[in-house]
Amino acid sequence: MDKQILVIGGTGMLGDSVTRQLREDGFKVRVMARDLQKAQAQFGAAYELFAGDVTDLGDLEQALAGCYGVHISVGGPADQISAENVAALAPELGLEHVTYVSGSTVRDENSWFPMTAQKLAAESAVSQCGVPYTIFRPTWPMEQLPRFVRDGRATLVGDIKTPWHWFAAADFGRMVANA
């Protein structure tokens, strides 16, 4: 397959599974990473690696050059700006698909929480950029379960009224690659 996909956030837990699945499915994969040494240690020479910052439009434009699509899997402060920057560049660069990782609790009624407000703004930018897109709102990857256990006891946050639905990061990688 000749389609090149840029993965932003490919060194993270979910980004890693997406990166590996895309390559397994025959896509050419370019990983944009702030820490090139970490990316090299994680992926070796099998992937095209691009050192850059998603908040820098010049870096992002270079990373997206020649790509069919892009997957955004960024957390923290760069999440919203990375999606907005991709949305600004995607039409002019001829991207044909954008995928973005949001979250299961990202809804208007939760916009009082800063991270949720940022995710909503990122979703809006992606959905309005004019390029076909898929937004994923996953729950919790089961690989995170150890973070919920302290001293042999499970930690629960809030008044849990509905069951949590866990997923495997590898399954998520397959869903994104299929999109």
Positions of PLM-derived features:
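Oxidoreductase cofactor-interface core, primarily capturing Rossmann-like NAD(P)-dependent enzymes
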Residues: D2-G44, T55-G58, A65, P77-A78, ...
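Cofactor-binding loops of NAD(P)H-dependent oxidoreductases
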Residues: G52
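Glycine-rich, N-terminal phosphate-binding loop of Rossmann-like dinucleotide-binding domains
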Residues: S73-V74, S102
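N-terminal Rossmann-like NAD(P) cofactor-binding module of classical short-chain dehydrogenase/reductase
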Residues: L64, Y68-H71, T99
